[in-house]
Regions:
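A short, flexible loop at the N-terminus of ABC-type nucleotide-binding domains that lies
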Residues: 1-4, 13-26, 57-64, 81-84, ...
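ABC-type ATPase nucleotide-binding domains, specifically the catalytic core motifs of the NBD
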Residues: 14-18, 56-61, 79-85, 112-128, ...
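P-loop NTP-binding/switch modules centered on Walker-like glycine-rich loops
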Residues: 42, 56, 173, 178, ...
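ABC ATPase NBD coupling module
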Residues: 58, 63, 76-94, 120, ...
Length: 323
């Protein structure tokens, strides 16, 4: 079966001190229509850069390395240039960027910003595009949508601005929606509302969703599968229920151990020791080795993704002991 999105061996490099460093290094994943994949990890692990690479939006002087593969069904994204590339941005992959206050243009009304996205991809009149913009605001749950069409971004709350960003991302009816930290800086109630909007839209439109987050709490019940990133690599991947029931990589276990729980016995939180190294200082072998409480001699060799169980893999030599 052809996946709606298939990424293989994605590597993104930047020049540094007369050499190149790889903040995204060999990332592979796929998405099917109607499913949600959560890409989870700490800040600086390469999640957002991975999402930008999907649309060839890696900032200069970065580059996507030869040998990387990004396919939208039967389309080779990395072979596209100019108008052909512009057509897939928004039309086949919609993007919700991290900070709606800086992503929205402060001097244009909300309705105009949504309308421009529609007109860029559909040959319709401005009046028809404005009607569609109104429908989109209704679809993402914005009250008084007619009034909000004429508002400027600073006149809206953080939750409302995030809903506008979702409407813009949906304007061209994409097959895939990439949501990069869609609930950052929102209070818990608004977070839940935004996630419910994304779930409802995924179901009603049959879209695939790539949910990028550092927060394990929003993944449970929202994603079909989870891929955990560390130091530019996917280090564990599994269906969500399986990963939450049996986190196997020491880093993933550390993430769960550092999350407060409201049920069960009272226990002390256990932080992961040390800090994530910079791409220019990644260790040889397993990249988590200097921080890992379970490191052993073989950890000095770089592990591939190894099977733990059916549909469950991790980048750790301990997987051999699971077998």
């Amino acid at each position: 079966m052809t996946h709606v999105l298939d990424v293989q061996n994605l590597r993104v490099s930047f020049p540094a001190d007369h050499r190149r460093v790889y903040p995204v290094d060999g990332v592979s994943f796929w998405l099917d229509r109607g499913e949600t994949l959560a890409l989870v990890g700490e800040s600086g692990c390469g999640k957002s850069l991975t999402s930008l690479a999907l649309l060839q939006l890696v900032p200069n002087p970065g580059q996507i390395e030869p040998g990387s593969v990004i396919r939208l069904a039967d389309t080779d994204v990395l072979a596209l240039r100019g108008e052909a590339l512009r057509r897939i941005r928004g039309r086949r992959i919609g993007m919700i960027f991290q900070d709606p206050m800086t992503s929205l243009n402060p001097v244009f009304r909300v309705g105009d910003q949504i309308t421009e996205g529609i007109l860029a991809h559909f040959k319709i009149s401005r009046a028809e595009a404005r009607d569609r913009a109104l429908q989109l605001l209704q679809e993402v749950g914005i009250p008084d949508p007619v009034e909000r069409l004429n508002a400027y971004p600073h006149q809206l709350s953080g939750g409302m601005r995030q809903r506008v960003m979702i409407a813009i991302a949906l304007a061209a009816e994409p097959e895939i929606l990439v949501a990069d930290e869609p609930t950052t800086a929102l209070d818990v109630t608004v977070q839940a509302q935004i996630l419910e909007v994304l779930d409802r839209l995924r179901t009603s439109r049959g879209m695939a969703v790539l949910l990028i987050t550092h927060d394990l709490g929003i993944v449970a019940g929202r994603a079909d599968r989870v891929a955990v990133m560390y130091a530019g690599q996917i280090i564990e991947e599994a269906p969500t229920e399986l990963l939450f029931a049996n986190p196997s990589h020491p880093y993933t276990q550390g993430l769960f151990a550092s999350v407060p729980r409201i049920t069960g016995p009272l226990r002390r939180l256990t932080p992961i020791r040390g800090n994530v190294p910079a791409p220019s200082a990644w260790p040889s072998g397993c990249r988590f080795r200097p921080r890992c409480p379970k490191a052993f001699d073989k950890s000095e060799q770089e592990p591939p993704l190894l099977p733990v169980d059916t549909d469950h893999r991790m980048r750790c030599w301990l997987a051999e002991r699971h077998g």
